[in-house]
């Protein structure tokens, strides 16, 4: 079985890593659109366009299922993709919501994500349907900090403090959704700043959503494609995955031409 995944950059590799721990035999094709990262500050229409191009690329790799390893796309383009393609397409938002519902005892949940994810209100609407009080905050600098390999630095710590200082005073919140697949890479800094809050990530929670779709069979291959490959990209892939990979380049213009 072949799983396709895509994200705006390297953050979706946190999803790939979680999936690979459970499904060690499947074949995985990953596309990171590093030439156009971040998606979270772009319009819904642009996100849909980019998402269609990425999904179409994966379809052409003969994948059996697509995991949208990006909250901005899951929030703004999943319905459009499901209408366009016939194979199963799974986003990360529902998994994050389910994890938060299991985690929270106070029924007060914080959500952090890109501007596109927070402004979509998808997390808020899903949680409020279960009578959960939500507190949402966009953290647009977190993705560039990760993509620039500034993890666990003074810069990342200052950004965490800048964006999350209001959560320090919201004593009822016991759970914080990391509503972007890049954000688990800042988990150490976030946990140090908010030690009293449980952090949940859709990158881990997605496993329960694909159990009925994915069969653990294949040749255990992993192909990593990126629309821009810099030294940072290679180093981040090794940092996240714990090993080196042969990264493959895809021209971003070819994505549009073949869609």
UniProtKB/Swiss-Prot annotation:
- Biological process, per Gene Ontology: cell wall organization; peptidoglycan biosynthetic process; regulation of cell shape
Keyword Isomerase belongs to the record: yes
Which Enzyme Commission number(s) are on file for it?
A: 5.1.1.3
Task: Quote the Gene3D superfamilies the UniProt record gives.
Answer: 3.40.50.1860
Binding, substrate = 7-8, 39-40, 71-72, 181-182
InterPro entries, per the entry = Asp/Glu/hydantoin_racemase, Asp/Glu_race, Asp/Glu_racemase_AS_2, Glu_race
Which keywords does the record carry? Cell shape, Cell wall biogenesis/degradation, Isomerase, Peptidoglycan synthesis
- Catalysed reaction, written as an equation: L-glutamate = D-glutamate
Q: What residues form the catalytic site here? A: 70, 180
Query: Which pathway does this polypeptide act in?
Result: Cell wall biogenesis; peptidoglycan biosynthesis
What's the short name of a Pfam family annotated to this entry? Asp_Glu_race
Checking PANTHER family in the record gives: GLUTAMATE RACEMASE
Name of the protein: Glutamate racemase
What is the organism of origin for this protein? Hydrogenobaculum sp. (strain Y04AAS1)
């Amino acid at each position: 079985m072949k799983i396709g995944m895509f994200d705006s950059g390297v953050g979706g590799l946190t999803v790939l890593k979680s999936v690979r721990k459970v499904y060690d035999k499947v074949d995985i094709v990953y596309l990171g659109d590093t030439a156009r990262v971040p998606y979270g500050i772009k319009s819904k229409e642009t996100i849909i366009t980019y998402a269609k191009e990425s999904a179409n690329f994966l379809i052409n790799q003969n994948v059996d299922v697509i995991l949208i390893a990006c909250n901005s796309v899951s929030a703004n383009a999943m319905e459009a993709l499901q209408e366009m393609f016939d194979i199963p397409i799974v986003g990360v938002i529902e998994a994050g919501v389910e994890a938060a519902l299991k985690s929270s005892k106070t029924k007060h949940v914080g959500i952090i994500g890109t501007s596109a994810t927070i402004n979509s209100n998808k997390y808020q609407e899903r949680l409020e349907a279960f009578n959960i009080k939500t507190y949402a905050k966009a953290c647009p600098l977190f993705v560039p900090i990760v993509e620039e390999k500034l993890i666990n630095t003074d810069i990342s710590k200052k950004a965490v403090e800048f964006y999350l200082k209001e959560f320090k005073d919201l004593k009822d919140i016991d759970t914080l959704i990391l509503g972007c697949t890049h954000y688990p890479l800042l988990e150490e800094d976030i946990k140090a700043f908010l030690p009293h809050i449980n952090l949940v990530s859709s990158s881990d929670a997605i496993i329960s959503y694909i159990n009925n779709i994915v069969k653990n069979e294949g040749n255990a291959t992993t192909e990593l494609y990126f629309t821009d490959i810099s030294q940072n990209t290679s180093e981040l892939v090794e940092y996240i995955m714990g090993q080196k990979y042969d990264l493959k380049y895809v021209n971003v213009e070819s994505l549009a031409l073949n869609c």
